[in-house]
Amino acid sequence: MKISSKQPRKQRKFLYNAPLHVRQKLMSAPLSRELREKYKVRNLPVRVGDKVRIMRGDYKGHEGKVVEVDLKRYRIYVEGATLRKTNGTEVFYPIHPSNVMIIELNLEDEKRKKIIERRAG
């Protein structure tokens, strides 16, 4: 998964052509200080069900559960971070995972627990 080139065009090309299993890893967000101390891991890929705090942008400070992870567009959708369209419907505002902090993990998946244990060392 290592990107060896420093050229911006090749960086962009890598992101554009990245396969889904690589995109999943690129959708990482930092953990809160409490979670970092508890699990000894600095960041993890965001998953549906994680509770996050938005750190940057118009919705800064807002907290909510992740409703959807869009690997194609490298965006996540958070409960409560919505826009009202002109026809009145509510749509989720797309947020890049680097702009959020995970404050509560969804640990229903046993594989995810094993990943955290393995990465903690």
Swiss-Prot record:
Pfam families: KOW (PF00467), Ribosomal_L26 (PF16906)
One GO molecular-function entry: rRNA binding
Domain of life per record: Archaea
Keyword field contains Ribonucleoprotein: yes
Biological processes annotated in GO: translation
InterPro entries: KOW, Rib_uL2_dom2, Ribosomal_uL24_CS, Ribosomal_uL24_euk/arc, Ribosomal_uL24_KOW, Translation_prot_SH3-like_sf
Keywords: Ribonucleoprotein, Ribosomal protein, RNA-binding, rRNA-binding
SUPFAM superfamilies (alphabetical): Translation proteins SH3-like domain
Record-level GO cellular component terms: large ribosomal subunit
Function recorded in the entry: One of two assembly initiator proteins, it binds directly to the 5'-end of the 23S rRNA, where it nucleates assembly of the 50S subunit.
HAMAP family on file: Ribosomal_uL24_A
Family membership: Belongs to the universal ribosomal protein uL24 family.
Database matches in NCBIfam families: rplX_A_E
Quaternary organization: Part of the 50S ribosomal subunit.
Protein name from the UniProt record: Large ribosomal subunit protein uL24
Source organism of the structure: Pyrococcus furiosus (strain ATCC 43587 / DSM 3638 / JCM 8422 / Vc1)
Native organism taxonomy: Archaea, Methanobacteriati, Methanobacteriota, Thermococci, Thermococcales
